[in-house]
Amino acid sequence: MKCTIVGATGYAAIELIRLIELHPHLEIVSLISDSQTNQEMNDLYSFMNNKQFPVLTAFSLEQIEAVETDLLFLATPSGISTKYLKQLDDWKGTVIDLSGDLRLEKSLYEKWYPHESVDTVLQKKATYGLTEWKREQIKDSRLIANPGCYATAVLLGLLPLLEERVIDPSQIIIHASSGLSGAGKTLTEQTHHVRSSENVRLYKMNQHQHIPEIESIAEDITGQQITVSLATYLVPLNRGIMATMTLQPLVEKTEAEWRTWFIEKYKQESFIRVGQTDPEIKSAAGSNYCDISVYLDTRTGRLTVVSVLDNMQKGAAGQAIQNANVIGGYPETLGLTQQPFFI
């Protein structure tokens, strides 16, 4: 498939480029950046010097069609994707949007995001791209709302439990930490090295835009209404997310039984690994894996589920490629089998 990336100079786009270069059936034919028009990617990023990429151009539907694009990735920030989505509504190719602009219905979006919502009719055309749980719908979709990074980590840990009605849906407490790439490429005081190095910072307490995404998608998939408390932290890492979910189980199982239960639930999934060792971000960084660990506190009776993934891969570009594989009829793991960096 011939691919165009819009917002080609951002972190998620760079990861997309890296993954597409590893994919035997995906080819980059156009790179779009309204802010860096007419520049070369290898002038902006020295690690690309050994490759020849298309010159960056401004967004143009005519150009996208001229290079015979089959698959377009929107790697633009929320609020920016919306203006492109309007122009792409009648386009015949496939769009995978990595922003949050298609994930929520209008009233929720405008409550949690500081932007005007995309058209309701257009939003309803989109399929939520949590691959392991929406695979059949993704196959036939031409408009994908790629999930958020925190939402991916949390939903992969929660959905098996919610589907079986084995936890209290009103007692879900989540603490989630993200590497700095999750804050995007634009420099802020909070992501400045002096402020972020040797520091852990709480941000958007109970106000993160992935809260309604988690709640609405959980209800859509399982039919069960949930409420979550979410505390999010920036930690001095380049990439990675660890989400720790404290839950109240409604059935009695031992820790070993809960772990076996999760293994059974995800036994067919190539990118979900249920482990017996304590989780760490390094075990997933640089890969499309999500590692899940399960703990039971016999003193309080509470269940803790920990999900670890790479926010740039499984939480963004990797999941987008996974969805592209599903749409293209390719093996789901194609181009995504690289092991974690670890060191």
UniProtKB/Swiss-Prot annotation:
According to the UniProt record, one GO cellular component term is: cytoplasm
Residue positions of the active site: 149
| Gene Ontology terms: biological process | L-arginine biosynthetic process
Q: Which Gene3D superfamilies match?
A: Dihydrodipicolinate Reductase, domain 2 (3.30.360.10), NAD(P)-binding Rossmann-like Domain (3.40.50.720)
Quote the EC number. 1.2.1.38
InterPro entries assigned: AGPR_AS, AGPR_type-1, NAD(P)-bd_dom_sf, NAGSA_dehydrogenase, Semialdehyde_DH_NAD-bd
What is this enzyme's catalytic activity, as reactions?
N-acetyl-L-glutamate 5-semialdehyde + phosphate + NADP(+) = N-acetyl-L-glutamyl 5-phosphate + NADPH + H(+)
Q: In which pathway does it act?
A: Amino-acid biosynthesis; L-arginine biosynthesis; N(2)-acetyl-L-ornithine from L-glutamate: step 3/4
Matches recorded under CDD domains: AGPR_1_C, AGPR_1_N
Record function comment: Catalyzes the NADPH-dependent reduction of N-acetyl-5-glutamyl phosphate to yield N-acetyl-L-glutamate 5-semialdehyde.
Family recorded in the similarity comment: Belongs to the NAGSA dehydrogenase family. Type 1 subfamily.
Protein name in UniProt? N-acetyl-gamma-glutamyl-phosphate reductase
Which species? Exiguobacterium sibiricum (strain DSM 17290 / CCUG 55495 / CIP 109462 / JCM 13490 / 255-15)
Q: What is the lineage of its organism?
A: Bacteria, Bacillati, Bacillota, Bacilli, Bacillales
